[in-house]
Amino acid sequence: MILNEWGEGSYIEPHKEFGFGYLDAIREVFTSAPKAHVDLTPADVGLPVPQVEMTFTSKPQWEFVRDTYGWDNGMNLDNPRIESGALTAVTTGNDPAFFGPPVQIAASRYRRLRLRMRLESAEQQFDDMGQVFWSTRSLAESESTSVRFPVHVDGKWHDYTLNLGENPRWRGVVTRLRLDPCARARVKVQIARIELLP
């Protein structure tokens, strides 16, 4: 039965505050049904929506030998491409970022991220900060869903391992990763590999 109480229409249904009281009143006024009855409700009323864990068909690992695997989208980067077996770009601003492809990764299975990266500046050698962000089905990408790590801008290859699991917001199903390789302009970035580890 559909009611048109306010003009937009509504269903007769239990009320959050008053439960089945409104329905009981309608039954008593308009029917000859006995007062004794059972109110039926789904067993999962009031429970949180379950997070269904979808699994990666293979290990979440990207080797940038011939393909960008969707990591060629970003900001403050000039011409992300594969060059010399690495995802390569030059930063054009102080907040460069590689946006990863859409994924469905159970955070509980992978608590660390490891990447092999080389940063080079024509001006000088220096240390800087990188950052990895993530979004989940219930959390948007933000400072609170990120981990910072020190990087070396010295033209040499370095392996960086980040403990994402230390952040309490690394949970649920991760839907995208974002890598900020540094926080400077005019830095050549080369990434050979990004992988998630248990």
Predicted regions and their residues:
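Short beta-strand-to-coil "C-cap" segments at the C-terminal boundary of structured domains/repeats
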Residues: 28-33, 192-198
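Extracellular ligand-binding interfaces
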Residues: 87-168, 173, 182-190, 195-196
